[in-house]
């Protein structure tokens, strides 16, 4: 008699509030660290971002299971680190149905991830949905500087 035993390990998805440090630990560190280190934002744009970051807070809805989140969220934090972002950033994990235990994804009309929502003085000013229109730092600059920005899914 032959008995085969197989063991499969699946990455645990994080649903609800996420501490950035949790993405820097396994099983998420593999993709987070690689994408963070490989992303090279444009220096000129970083300098411009520093001048428009006042009174900005950001909420990021992401799926640790989502390839777009795995690519853009680390790049986003690289940009924030390069510009020495001073505001608050809140990370929220969603399940594959784009839901959260508290209903915050539904309340914020999250249809695709990642979604980066930018607030100034407590009011939403705009959002990046799933992927940037140009480069991530260019989209952030357009939003924070008040340019006419439409995310990927806006008509």
Residue ranges and their predicted role:
Residues 92-112, 141-144:
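Thioredoxin-like thiol-disulfide oxidoreductase module
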Residues 60-64, 87-100:
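Thiol-based oxidoreductase modules, predominantly thioredoxin-like and allied folds used
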Residues 12-53:
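N-terminal leader/targeting and pre-domain segments
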Residues 49-83:
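Local sequence-structure signature of Cys/Sec-based thiol-disulfide redox active-site neighborhoods
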Residues 54-57, 87-88, 121:
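Loop/turn elements at helix/coil->beta-strand transitions in domains of secreted/extracellular proteins
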Residues 1-14:
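Bacterial Sec-dependent N-terminal signal peptides
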